[in-house]
Amino acid sequence: MQKPGQNIDFALKETSPKIGAGSVTGDKLCSTYDLVEQMHYLYVRVVKAKELPGKDVTGSCDPYVEVKLGNYRGMTKHFEKRSNPEWKQVFAFSKERIQASILEVVVKDKDVVLDDLIGRIMFDLNEIPKRVPPDSPLAPQWYRLEDRHGRKVKGELMLAVWMGTQADEAFSDAWHSDAATVGPEGVTHIRSKVYLSPKLWYVRVNVIEAQDLIPHDKTKFPEVYVKAMLGNQTLRTRISQTKTLNPMWNEDLMFVVAEPFEEALILAVEDRVAPNKDETLGRCAIPLQNVQRRLDHRPLNSRWFNLEKHIMVEGEQKEIKFASRIHLRIFLEGGYHVLDESTHYSSDLRPTAKQLWKPSIGLLEVGIISAHGLMPMKSKDGKGTTDAYCVAKYGQKWIRTRTIVDSFTPKWNEQYTWEVFDTCTVITFGAFDNGHIPGGSGKDLRIGKVRIRLSTLEADRIYTHSYPLLVFHPSGIKKTGEIQLAVRFTCLSLINMLHMYSQPLLPKMHYIHPLSVLQLDSLRHQAMNIVSARLNRAEPPLRKEIVEYMLDVDSHMWSMRRSKANFFRIMNVLSGLIAVGKWFDQICNWRNPITTILIHVLFIILVLYPELILPTVFLYLFLIGIWNFRWRPRHPPHMDTRLSHADAVHPDELDEEFDTFPTSRSSEIVRMRYDRLRSIGGRVQTVIGDLATQGERFLSLLSWRDPRATTLFVLFCLIAAIVLYVTPFQVVALLAGIYVLRHPRFRHKLPSVPLNLFRRLPARSDSLL
């Protein structure tokens, strides 16, 4: 699992948690939560009360319920002047932390100084029933209240008390004893939730033409363009080349929009009357609810829209109706996949229109078990603490675990399931510190992130590993802990899964009507902003900093470290070809005579029987694949600090990576970095120039730029054509191969004649300034 040279602290570790997969617990098979460790809870459901006696002078009461178990106390909200209140609240106490044998449920009357006791109910924990799904929920019962001496008093309380697990339906909305220090205002921020990304569409606006425009200055030809606005997205067409009152553009503008459509598309026709002054000639607003939808590449009908104009008359805005109009073709593109995350870590590749979706090929089940070794993320009461929760994103579904308060070893043991439509996708996990509970900073801090590509997983196998949580800081890479996950990919149809590998990665509209790289980058940025804004409006919100971190918003920003990492990745890819070249050089120089003789024999066989060449190549590749099967990866890939060049990054390069855009550093630092970038660019420029020179020399072979060199090459081609025509191909190939593999005794160290001729050819470098 650990790669050579990698720090063992940053390595992936295989674990053996006590999960319920395939095991029998009690009398029931744990199938719903079989990828997590089973956690037992005491549940208390407080439903309502009736006929509570009045304790005030007025004869009324302000009741609330207090559930006490040892040192833990949970309270419902209180009602004013209600003798028959309804709470419908659930309390969950972790069995691991229970240190008492009696559960006490107390009904009290809220008072200014001291709350009065109305009555209580006592439960022996040994007598409480057990309930595990798929059993039906336990029906609540009416219990008569008792005073401190055990005597029956007036009033009844409807309760349900049972021992259950985290698989219980009441678990997610319950008050938890491990969050007892969190006040009522913070409870909503610590519960587990499932979020759905908004459904995103591309909006294509084909601006065709306008008619009968009325400019203010009729003495000059108008320079007209169309400005389109949708939310905070603004795009402009080019200025029309037809300088008339009926300009034409026939230009496409692309936007991103999310359902439900809350904003209208606003189009304004503007005239460039001066370099920094534009005049609006008319505008129109188009609700997107009325826009037609396109699922394929078939053209749709265009429409004419009337333009309106508003002017100020005596301080009031008045609308002028005139005959100007604009010709548009507007539709929602359902055949594209709207990219809202980094293209390298996409978790969903389906088109927007659900009619075009293909059947799912499998299920992805994930158990978020625990974390350990977390670093203190904030200070509370003079000591470091962490309130950790986990977020996972795959497809349109986001999940957020509950927050474990004040723990460096949180145990979540929550299990989630996703449908899988393509294995060439990535699920992303992020761990965060909750900053929205008492003592928090108001911002959720990053603890670390884990990515798992589904295509690297074997079907129907459970992967249980502890993944390092790594975060970049201005001081360098820092390990903030480890997270323990259990992952299982279940294949529903092997035929469909294998057939998927023959299909295009993206929907067909991306290939029939492709979008430019600049368009895709801009649209992806807009889609990220829309998803971030929508999830930030949920309750509880999934904060903007969380969504941006999970979607890798800053993945396109310049980083010297990433550039080095990508360069060495290329060198690693080319290392195989370089090794083959070195091996061939050793063969040609007879470093190992036996191997060289065997290569001669193999070469002669292939020349005499050329029909064996392709079968031999594919058989060789087959044998390599079978041989490598013994050493196939048995664990998912993880964040590699050595590959990322994160373990030896220069402090200034790291500071540059954390710089804002535009820069916020001093002019001296920016000048130094600019000079460094110029130096690197100069070396890149030299390499590119050398490549261009070699290509231009090749083109000049027949260009007669050097008449003597071209004459020699033309004569050589004529002689070669005659020789190859009269000589069997096998003889030519055999002689050429033996010449290349000749013994060093028949070689000399000077360059060959063809190479000498090639290096003497002219290039366009002489024409550069």
Swiss-Prot record:
A GO term for molecular function: metal ion binding
Expression tissues: Highly expressed in roots meristems and shoot apical meristems (SAMs). Observed in flowers.
Location in or out of the cell: Endoplasmic reticulum membrane
Stated role: May function as a signaling molecule by regulating the trafficking of other regulators.
Family to which this protein belongs: Belongs to the MCTP family.
SUPFAM superfamilies per record: C2 domain (Calcium/lipid-binding domain, CaLB) (SSF49562)
Record-level GO cellular component terms: endoplasmic reticulum membrane; plasmodesma
Binding site for Ca(2+) 2: 56, 109, 111, 116
Keywords: Calcium, Endoplasmic reticulum, Glycosyltransferase, Membrane, Metal-binding, Repeat, Transferase, Transmembrane, Transmembrane helix
Origin: domain of life: Eukaryota
Required co-factors: Ca(2+)
C2 domain location: 23-143, 184-305, 345-467
The protein's name in its UniProt record: Multiple C2 domain and transmembrane region protein 5
Regions that span the bilayer: 604-624, 712-732
Pfam entry (one): C2
Topology term for the membrane: Multi-pass membrane protein
Database matches in SMART domains: C2
Residues given in the record as Ca(2+) 1 binding sites: 56, 62, 109, 111
